[in-house]
Every structure is written in C-alpha cells, then in structure tokens.
C-alpha cells in the first residue's frame, strides 16, 4: 500500500509471501512514482514476487462510481476514462484519484491491458421504482441523483460464494 502520495513522509508497505513486512519511505510526489514503487517492489530480486513485468497480464482497478454507464468489468480505453470522469461529481473523493492511478498504470505499462470494476455495477439491475424511491424526480432528471448501491464488488463475491456453499445456481 502506498500512503501519503503527494505529501511529505510518503511510504510503501508490503509483505512478500512468506517474508517480513517491508516498510520503505519513498518520495512519491504523484501516483506515477507510487505505481513505479509498486512495480519495483513486485520485481525486487530479493523480495519480489515476479521476475519482471512481462508476467503481469493485466491490471485491475476498483472504481467507486460508474454512474449508469457500467454494469460489468470493462477494458479501459479513452472513452471509458471519459465516462468515469463524467461520474466524478457522484464520487468526488474517489473517482478522480482512480483516474490518476489508471493513467499512471497505462503510462508505466503501456502494453498491459487495464480493466475496471465498479462498486455500482452490481446494483444496475435495480428497477427504476427502487432506485428512485423517495427521491424527487427532478434530482434524477437534472443530475442523475438516484440510488446506485455501493460495495457491489463485495456483494457480488459474497452472493456467489453463498450460492456455491449452498449448492444453489
């Protein structure tokens, strides 16, 4: 985990498989340096878990809000980034940082596909009567304010796992 990106005292913390927790104070003025620090940790000759970045076949990003655009995992391209940016007003503390991280990964690993999953995607099948319940229609019409549902990646995993345990399709 990279913490304090863009401020003094930035640090990366990770624990190699079977090893001790590693904590390094590294100057990370932007997400670019933070992603670079992660790459160096992954490929470190002594504590890394991969030999080189050719072993990384894709990069996954969890994005908080996909608005009404996304209902499943999506391969990142310029149009996807634009649509995530259009949802920034719905998750102003999260989406902009997600975009910065996605762009940093794409720049540092230009030949590696990037995929996004959205916390709101799981709830996209909610009927209009449920997602507009108790919300004035004008808020939805003017600003797409509605119930979106959150933590969908967790809900998806748990519901699939419970179905598996209970032998239910």
Residue ranges and their predicted role:
Residues 1-67:
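N-terminal glycine/serine-rich phosphate-binding loop of ATP-dependent small-molecule kinases
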Residues 19-22, 33, 78-81, 133-137:
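Short, low-complexity, polar/charged sequence segments that are solvent-exposed and flexible
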Residues 22-24, 83-88, 143-145:
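Short glycine/proline- and acidic residue-enriched helix-loop micro-motifs
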Residues 28-32, 36, 74, 78, ...:
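Electropositive phosphate-/nucleotide-binding environments in soluble metabolic enzymes
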Residues 42, 48-94, 122-132:
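Short beta-strand-loop/turn "lid" adjacent to the catalytic site in phosphate-handling enzymes
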Residues 95-169:
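Phosphate-binding/catalytic loop of phosphoryl-transfer enzymes
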